[in-house]
Amino acid sequence: MTLRIATVSLNSAVDQTVTVPGFTADAVNRVAASRIDAGGKGVNVASFLAHVGHGVAVTGLLGAENAALFARHFAATGLVDACQRLPGATRTNVKIVDPLQDQVTDLNFPGIAAGPADLDAVAATLTELLAQGLDWVALCGSLPAGIGAEAYAELAALARKGGARVALDTSGPALGLALAARPDIVKPNVAELGAHLGRTLTGLESVREAARDLAASGVGLVAVSMGAGGAVLVRGAEAVLAIPPATPIASTVGAGDAMVAGLIHAATLGLDLAETARLATAFSLGALGEIGPHLPPPERLAALARTVTVKTLPPV
């Protein structure tokens, strides 16, 4: 399979999903089920893209102590493993899923310590991958301690120089700095976008205006995820609202990452904005129906896409 996409995962994680019916804080709880998956945003986006037939490489940073879990996952999913190994263990993120109360509690651990030399190694690997003719580079997730907020801005510029389009899914200072590279896709959630713009976003109108402001800064496509409220997508003068149907949630692990993968997949298919919104939302719905960072079969994704309502929004 031809390698066309690379994801960068600087702060990968072991995703532990624990099912605890009736979870109660400050009490003894019994675990009904548990599973462990190789994860982190960049890993998840790569896995989802491979699931729908793309040739994908993952570069970034992993702790050597538990890298075998990731190596097995990469081999099983057909991903190219281009990750650097660092001393120590990749962090664990725990999601406590309570199906009775329809709640998910997140426990996110700090990432492995890294430094400028490690980022240089990732950049060198990305340069080698770009030389193979990448179409897309996805920069995903938070940054570990020791890596400066400018990391994604530098990698985005590198990807641009290498002829690739750039998708960005991060938050905080890393988001603000990377926007200078004018990525082709940016997918913040409502809270992340509001924090970046310095204002609270309440209601569809404020989200639409904020997405338009971000698009006006030079971003090709802005997709703002709003949880059960759907997503607002803005590209140029166009704006749409994707409304998902009410659906049972098995786990929220990877739902946002699935939307990023759906946006990239839609771009490779040349879909218009409405169909892009429909497909990306279907990817997110598919992940919500699975335990752990997984997608259902492609035919199920197609069926989910047909359940998504897309409304055209007036230009700002």
Curated annotation (Swiss-Prot):
Stretches that traverse the bilayer: none
Residues involved in ATP binding: 225-230, 256-257
Residues annotated as catalytic: 257 (proton acceptor)
The protein's enzyme class: transferase
Catalytic activity reported: beta-D-fructose 1-phosphate + ATP = beta-D-fructose 1,6-bisphosphate + ADP + H(+)
Signal sequence region: none
Keyword annotations from UniProtKB, A to Z: ATP-binding, Kinase, Nucleotide-binding, Transferase
PANTHER family according to UniProt: 1-PHOSPHOFRUCTOKINASE, 1-PHOSPHOFRUCTOKINASE-RELATED
Record family assignment: Belongs to the carbohydrate kinase PfkB family.
Name of the protein in its database record: 1-phosphofructokinase
